Amino acid sequence: MKQYLDLEKYVLENGTQKGDRTGTGTISTFGYQMRFDLQEGFPIMTTKRVPFKLVVSELLWFLHGDTNIRYLLQHNNNIWNEWAFERFVKSADYKGEDMTDFGLRAERDPAFKEVYQAEMEQFKTRILEDEGFANKYGELGNIYGKQWREWKTSQGETIDQLADVIEMIKTNPNSRRLIVSAWNPEDIPNMALPPCHSLFQFYVADGKLSCQLYQRSADIFLGVPFNIASYALLTHLIAREVGLDVGEFIHTMGDAHLYNNHIEQVKEQLSRTPHALPKLVLSDKPTTIFDFDVADISLDGYHPDPAIKAPISV
């Protein structure tokens, strides 16, 4: 997608070198927006393969209000493992090798990488096979799904923001309050990772549903391709339920950054030519967005270039 490649190029050419929480370092810009017309095809990278089923299972995990990686692992989705693992290795229950700064050390030290990978595999197996262990160490805190579906009020009640917004789209589509927020300051200290994609808003006009996302922190090479596909999919699912066509997905970013250890991968991607976008295919079986299974969602005509691997910064 040209919009995304333009973002990569802009940050490479105009970004500022900055330090960051992970110690990796970034090239960063502040305030950038991309627009995608969802009528023109499903916006997923074609200049590198994005594992769409992982996008689907993560979004369904959010929609279920789940915050435990066990569901993700049951669907062969490993994208949240590092944050749960980090909590475990910092606990008194962990008795293995020192895992301080495991992400950076695994990237730089092949011997340590083998130890880390073995510890991670043991951790994943325990999450899948030991429900008690999963309940304790598979939890990531009150992250996205919990805030979307069970925002806690000062009176001890809960608000299902997503269900409320869907109902409002049906009954009052001209509302300017079609907003869901994952940014709950009270819960931030207890989250494994504070929400990067923090708030989204819907807009109805001319029989079409559009969505704008505000993302406070945007990992351009690894995270943003998932975010684009995820929120485009969410827009399609809700539009289907409320009887609207899809309009635009607008992606607004705060700190949009390229990690220093992703620069060569970005240059490789920029050397590639985008292909035609695929079409989203949804099963007729589910009646609401909360009824979908992974098998109900697929892409037709997705023929991307090969994946480009890059390390994740934790």
From Swiss-Prot:
MF annotations from Gene Ontology: thymidylate synthase activity
Which N-terminal stretch is annotated as signal sequence?
none
Which biological process terms from the Gene Ontology are attached to this UniProt entry? dTMP biosynthetic process; dTTP biosynthetic process; methylation
Q: What is its main location?
A: cytoplasm
Alphabetic keyword roster: Cytoplasm, Methyltransferase, Nucleotide biosynthesis, Transferase
Q: In which pathway does it act?
A: Pyrimidine metabolism; dTTP biosynthesis
Q: What is its EC number?
A: 2.1.1.45
Residues annotated for dUMP binding in this entry = R21, R176, R177, R216, S217, A218, D219, N227, H257, L258, Y259
Positions contributing to (6R)-5,10-methylene-5,6,7,8-tetrahydrofolate binding:
D219, S313
**What is the active site of this protein?**
C196
* EC top class, as a word: transferase
Q: Which CDD domains match?
A: TS_Pyrimidine_HMase
- Looking at the keywords, is Zinc-finger present? no
* Gene Ontology cellular-component terms listed: cytosol
Transferase listed as a keyword: yes
Q: Which domain of life is it from?
A: Bacteria
User: Where is the protein found, in the record's own terms?
Assistant: Cytoplasm
Reaction equation(s) it catalyzes: dUMP + (6R)-5,10-methylene-5,6,7,8-tetrahydrofolate = 7,8-dihydrofolate + dTMP
> What's its job?
Catalyzes the reductive methylation of 2'-deoxyuridine-5'-monophosphate (dUMP) to 2'-deoxythymidine-5'-monophosphate (dTMP) while utilizing 5,10-methylenetetrahydrofolate (mTHF) as the methyl donor and reductant in the reaction, yielding dihydrofolate (DHF) as a by-product. This enzymatic reaction provides an intracellular de novo source of dTMP, an essential precursor for DNA biosynthesis.
Would you identify the family this protein belongs to, as annotated?
Belongs to the thymidylate synthase family. Bacterial-type ThyA subfamily.
How it assembles, according to the record, is:
Homodimer.
PANTHER family of this UniProt entry?
Answer: THYMIDYLATE SYNTHASE, THYMIDYLATE SYNTHASE 1
What is this protein's record name?
Thymidylate synthase
Q: Which organism is it from?
A: Listeria welshimeri serovar 6b (strain ATCC 35897 / DSM 20650 / CCUG 15529 / CIP 8149 / NCTC 11857 / SLCC 5334 / V8)
